[in-house]
Swiss-Prot record:
This is Acetyl-coenzyme A carboxylase carboxyl transferase subunit beta. The gene is accD. Acetyl-CoA carboxylase is a heterohexamer composed of biotin carboxyl carrier protein (AccB), biotin carboxylase (AccC) and two subunits each of ACCase subunit alpha (AccA) and ACCase subunit beta (AccD). It is found in: Cytoplasm. Zn(2+) binds at residues 29, 32, 48, 51. The lineage of its organism: Bacteria, Pseudomonadati, Pseudomonadota, Gammaproteobacteria, Thiotrichales. Residues 25-284 form the CoA carboxyltransferase N-terminal domain. Its EC number is 2.1.3.15. InterPro entries: AcCoA_carboxyl_beta, Acetyl_CoA_COase_Trfase_b_su, ClpP/crotonase-like_dom_sf, COA_CT_N, Znf-ACC. One of its GO terms (molecular function) is carboxyl- or carbamoyltransferase activity. It comes from Hydrogenovibrio crunogenus (strain DSM 25203 / XCL-2).
Length: 284
């Protein structure tokens, strides 16, 4: 028997063990490239336990973690997208919607809830980036306006977590109209002297960054979030120059006065509760 035949059984055993490892058990950090136990990363709110890199967090998971346990209640869940333009690119818009709904379990890219943070009542919304890149369409705009109205009715702050590539191409002008619609709604919130806190997460781009996302009484970002209008590659190709290191990242924007603060994901609930109480002049 040759040496290769002697070690062949052990090679087969290792291969069989690898086959028995369930899919999705492990993941890799895109920053430090550490191999991580998936359940541990989920418990840590998609923050790498090795290098503290903030990975993308789903909209529903974000809101459920943000609110005090058991206080979050979804609102406007009945609003669903329609294909008013009968739009078709590579595939029909209806097909894209159905595929995104099946993949994410969400009806559209924006989720709104009422709840409490550290005992303080708030209305909050969050984007699901996995739903067509968190794109802003007519459903998002309608749910945003309803969230504003809910905050006015309850006399409480509005907090929105943005994670979007921008306006939804398949809805054309209906999508672009949401930039004006959401911005106008914030005017009503401001007239009622209620705070709007905008939390910019990775990525916040396009029509979302060019409208309500930058209109917060405080504009707060997570660490290393990509924030801007056009992407850095598009800008480099247009101006034909190399962009500065960290351009469009939250630290760069804070240094240049475009945002107010950077807050670690684990501290958002405590910090925002404190900020909202101060703005509302309420004691803990």
């Amino acid at each position: 028997m040759s040496w290769f035949e002697k070690i062949l059984p052990s090679i087969k055993q290792v291969t069989e063990r690898k086959k028995n490892v369930p899919e999705g058990l492990w993941t890799k950090c895109p920053k430090c490239e550490s191999t991580l136990y998936r359940a541990e990363v989920r418990r840590n709110l998609e923050v790498c336990p090795k290098c503290d890199h903030h990975m993308r967090l789903g909209g529903r998971d974000r809101l459920e973690a943000f609110f005090d346990e058991g206080t979050g209640v979804e609102i406007s869940a009945e609003v669903t997208p329609v294909d008013a333009l009968k739009f078709k690119d590579i595939k029909p818009y209806k097909t894209r919607i159905a595929q995104a709904q099946k993949a994410t379990g969400e009806k559209d890219s924006f989720i709104t809830m009422t709840g409490k943070i550290q005992g303080l009542e708030v209305v909050a919304g969050a984007f699901e980036f996995k739903f067509m890149g968190g794109s802003m369409g007519s459903v998002m705009g309608e749910k945003f306006v309803r969230a504003v109205n809910e905050a006015i009715e309850r006399r409480c702050p509005l907090i929105v977590f943005s994670a979007s590539g921008g306006a939804r191409m398949q809805e054309a002008l209906f999508s672009l109209m949401q930039m004006a619609k959401t911005s106008a709604a914030l005017g009503h919130l401001r007239a009622n002297k209620l705070p709007f806190i905008s939390v910019l997460t990775d990525p916040t781009m396009g029509g979302v960054s060019a409208s309500f996302a930058m209109l917060g009484d405080l504009n707060i970002a997570e660490p290393k979030a990509l924030i801007g209008f056009a992407g850095p590659r598009v800008i480099e190709q247009t101006v034909r120059e190399k962009l500065p290191e960290g351009f469009q990242r939250s630290e760069f924007l804070l240094e240049h006065g475009a945002i107010d603060r950077i807050i670690h994901r684990h501290n958002l609930s405590d910090e925002l509760a404190s900020i909202c109480r101060m703005l509302l002049q309420k004691s803990a």
